[in-house]
From Swiss-Prot:
Record keywords: Acetylation, Cytoplasm, Disease variant, Exosome, Neurodegeneration, Nucleus, RNA-binding, rRNA processing
UniProt similarity note: Belongs to the RNase PH family.
Function: Non-catalytic component of the RNA exosome complex which has 3'->5' exoribonuclease activity and participates in a multitude of cellular RNA processing and degradation events. In the nucleus, the RNA exosome complex is involved in proper maturation of stable RNA species such as rRNA, snRNA and snoRNA, in the elimination of RNA processing by-products and non-coding 'pervasive' transcripts, such as antisense RNA species and promoter-upstream transcripts (PROMPTs), and of mRNAs with processing defects, thereby limiting or excluding their export to the cytoplasm.
Protein's recorded name: Exosome complex component RRP43
Cellular component GO terms, alphabetical: chromosome; cytoplasm; cytoplasmic exosome (RNase complex); cytosol; exosome (RNase complex); fibrillar center; intracellular membrane-bounded organelle; nuclear exosome (RNase complex)
Modified residues (N-acetylalanine): A2
Organism (species): Homo sapiens (Human)
Species lineage: Eukaryota, Metazoa, Chordata, Craniata, Vertebrata
Name of encoding gene: EXOSC8
Intrachain disulfide bonds: none
Main localisation: cytoplasm
Endoplasmic reticulum keyword on record: no
InterPro entries for this protein: ExoRNase_PH_dom1, ExoRNase_PH_dom2, ExoRNase_PH_dom2_sf, Exosome_comp_Rrp42_subfam, PNPase/RNase_PH_dom_sf, Ribosomal_Su5_D2-typ_SF, Rrp43
Subcellular location: Cytoplasm; Nucleus; Nucleus, Nucleolus
Length: 276
């Protein structure tokens, strides 16, 4: 009977749970799904990570290549993110050129990289005006069940922390790049941005880490990105119902708490990988 009611009146079905301060999957309104991260998942990439947020699964692979710097920024490299939402992750997506949601997610990740200064572009310079690194960050969703932005941000950060670049010098006689694969170093990750997403129900009720179904039924969504100092790096609100100042402040304080949880989880995984 409950399954039939959910099919016919999905929003009313959800409201009955929300009135009791819980959700159909058993979580409280402010409770996140189980989050896991696996670092170094792709052996052919220069850095990679697999993140699971409940059922939502995103893998990020980073590939480093040489490039010529732009004339207006001769000492800066590039970080190029791309989010792919293929049909295999959900029946809502079609094959072909990137859909609107994938484009929005790619732009969101690009904004996070730029605003948080996670990597100083100058750190990617090999020889000013001649040669820089370009980091291609490909994020692929393997299973879509809502809150793709949180999963992508976490996967990107974890993958970048896994990247090791070889030492590169320019031979003065030949002007060619010489790569020393035996001498590698990790990227200098300057900040640790973490995204926290919320769904708004009936213009007033806030829930964290929405599933795909909850996003579909919500009257609005909001994603806040904070760094370890509690600074706001990014705020993404694609239309929908408005929020009061008090509600927004509540979201930001929850985002600070979530940052600590995610950072702790990632630090533990990285520590467990290091040779004893």
């Amino acid at each position: 009977m409950a399954a039939g009611f959910k099919t016919v009146e999905p929003l009313e079905y959800y409201r009955r749970f929300l009135k009791e301060n819980c959700r159909p999957d058993g979580r409280e309104l402010g409770e996140f799904r189980t989050t896991t991260v696996n670092i170094g998942s792709i052996s052919t990439a220069d850095g990679s990570a697999l993140v699971k947020l409940g059922n939502t699964t995103v893998i990020c692979g980073v590939k480093a290549e040489f490039a010529a710097p732009s004339t207006d920024a001769p000492d800066k490299g590039y970080v190029v993110p791309n989010v792919d939402l293929p049909p295999l992750c959900s029946s809502r997506f079609r094959s072909g050129p990137p859909g609107e949601e994938a484009q929005v997610a790619s732009q969101f990740i690009a904004d996070v990289i730029e605003n948080s200064q996670i990597i100083q572009k100058e750190d990617l310079c090999i020889s000013p005006g001649k040669l820089v690194w370009v980091l291609y960050c490909d994020l692929i969703c393997l299973d879509y069940d809502g809150n793709i932005l949180d999963a992508c941000t976490f996967a990107l950060l974890a993958a970048l922390k896994n990247v090791q670049l070889p030492e590169v010098t320019i031979n003065e006689e030949t002007a060619l790049a010489e790569v020393n694969l035996k001498k590698k170093s990790y990227l200098n990750i300057r900040t640790h941005p973490v995204a926290t997403s919320f769904a708004v129900f009936d213009d007033t009720l806030l829930i964290v880490d929405p599933t795909g179904e909850e996003e579909h039924l919500a009257t609005g969504t909001l994603t806040i990105v904070m760094d370890e100092e509690g600074k706001l790096c990014c705020l993404h609100k694609p239309g929908g119902s408005g929020l009061t100042g008090a509600k927004l402040q509540d979201c930001m304080s929850r985002a600070v708490t979530r940052h600590k949880e995610v950072k702790k989880l990632m630090d533990e995984v990285i520590k467990s990988m290091k040779p004893k």
